[in-house]
Design a protein with these regions (language model features):
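Conserved glycine(s) in the ABC-transporter nucleotide-binding domain "signature"
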Residues: 1-105
Length: 105
């Protein structure tokens, strides 16, 4: 009985962490800034997905370095959080499978 209790506690903690990661992803700015060279001139666009399709919003010929850094950091953080979220989902699936059995442990 004690092992199942520990597994239930771990499952509850994992579900809470999953919600926290989802909120963290939602707080990040969506998309990424892309520099396109068109006829020898550089233009910046914000690229993101909406309803499964890529959307491109013109941001100007130049973008502030702080904005470039913000989107670069957000992209790195988004990748890190998504990796963690993927591992957490696998852990939750495993814990639910371990708790599914009817026999006493």
């Amino acid at each position: 009985m004690a092992i199942k209790d520990v597994l239930r506690e771990e499952l509850a903690a994992s579900v809470r962490m999953q919600a926290r990661f989802a909120a963290e992803l939602a707080a990040l700015p969506r998309g990424s800034l892309v520099r396109r060279i068109i006829k020898g001139h550089a233009y910046y666009y914000l690229i993101y997905r909406e309803n499964g399709r890529f959307q491109s919003v013109y941001r100007g010929k130049s973008v502030l370095p702080a904005e470039l850094r913000r989107y670069r950091e957000a992209k790195a953080k988004r990748a890190k959080v998504r990796r963690s979220l993927s591992q957490l989902k696998k852990q939750i699936r495993y814990l639910k499978g371990a708790l599914r059995g009817n026999e006493e442990i």
